[in-house]
Amino acid sequence: IKVSKLAEQFKLRIFNPYPLDLRIGSLWVNFQKKYEFNPIHDHDGVFSFIIFMKIPFIMEDELKASPGKNAKHNLAGHLQFFFLGENQQSHIEKIAIPADKTWEKRGLIFRSHLNHMVYPFYSSDDYRVTISGNFAFDNSNMRYDGPNN
């Protein structure tokens, strides 16, 4: 009898889960200067976001000013994401976002555990300013009935 009651509660949790509110878990502002970079990292929570408030360069000028201007992959000023390829075994895929002045007042939302980094910029003495944060589920209203209920 107890097993069937537990199975019934499990069925209710799967098909009628408690609602979870999505909340901002953390919020911060980044001020990045010329030559600075943000190394590869990920975040806490479920989703993260970046809002590009001020980007002090145009990508065309940035790529020309970069010390890697003759490199095969010049990523000056880019935001880059890293993830496993389709076979999920060893191939790492990369997506580079050329976030320049045209991205101002725009944003990105991505899974928090997605590794990413920000490359340095070289063509401006102004700050790159972004607002970033993490969304997390608020489960404070969840209750557990337990196997004895």
Annotate each predicted stretch with a short phrase.
Residues 1-38, 75:
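Non-heme Fe(II)/2-oxoglutarate
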Residues 16, 125-126:
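Short helix-terminating capping/connector loops at secondary-structure junctions
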Residues 25-109, 119, 126-129, 141, ...:
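Catalytic core of non-heme Fe(II) oxygenases with the double-stranded beta-helix
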Residues 114-117:
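Short, charged beta-turn/beta-strand-edge "cap" motif at the junction between a beta-strand
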Residues 133-149:
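Double-stranded beta-helix
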